[in-house]
């Protein structure tokens, strides 16, 4: 998958540019970059992942591609309470399927959203393969 594929997957879940969003389980940042592209300047993104090395690499990529975006990188476990402001939206791309018990995680995540906030899930379709699923 390339950047345009990531943008395409998120586009339908993002109704307008700007706002305060989080990418939970952001890994290497492919979807964080897509989110930055779609939200544009003036937005704020919280990128959360347990892998500090991945977050550092993500920060380098973001600075090179979107130097005017405000991104906060948090090395944390998104299944535990986080210090986040009320969010306009949350992206969880290929991170929820790692959670054995999804309901408590989704309840926690829902609590971060402002009224009317959006949760955008990107997950593998295990029933039908596609070019990007290993």
Range-by-range predicted roles:
Residues 22, 27-80:
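Class I SAM-dependent methyltransferase SAM/SAH-binding core
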Residues 103-118:
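A short glycine-rich, Lys/Arg-flanked "PGG" loop and its adjoining helix->strand segment in the class I
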Residues 1-20, 34:
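Conserved alpha-helix/loop element of class I SAM-dependent methyltransferases that forms part
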Residues 79-90:
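A short acidic, Gly/Pro-enriched loop at the edge of an enzyme's catalytic core
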Residues 88-102:
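A short SAM/SAH-binding and catalytic strip from SAM-dependent methyltransferases
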Residues 118-134:
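Conserved class I S-adenosyl-L-methionine
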Residues 20, 44, 116-118:
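Short glycine-centered segments of the SAM/dcSAM-binding site in methyltransferase folds
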């Amino acid at each position: 998958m390339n950047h345009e594929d990531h943008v395409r997957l998120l586009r339908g879940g993002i109704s307008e540019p700007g706002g305060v969003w989080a990418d939970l389980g952001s890994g290497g940042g492919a979807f964080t970059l897509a989110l930055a592209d779609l939200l544009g300047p003036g937005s704020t993104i919280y990128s959360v992942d347990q892998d500090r090395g991945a977050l550092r690499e993500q920060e380098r990529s973001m600075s090179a591609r979107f130097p005017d975006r405000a991104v906060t990188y948090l090395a944390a476990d998104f299944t535990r309470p986080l210090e986040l402001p009320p969010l306009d939206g949350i992206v969880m791309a290929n991170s929820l399927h790692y959670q054995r018990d999804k309901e408590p995680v989704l309840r926690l995540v829902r609590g971060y959203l402002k009224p009317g906030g959006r949760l955008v899930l990107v997950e593998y379709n295990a029933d039908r393969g596609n070019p990007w699923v290993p």
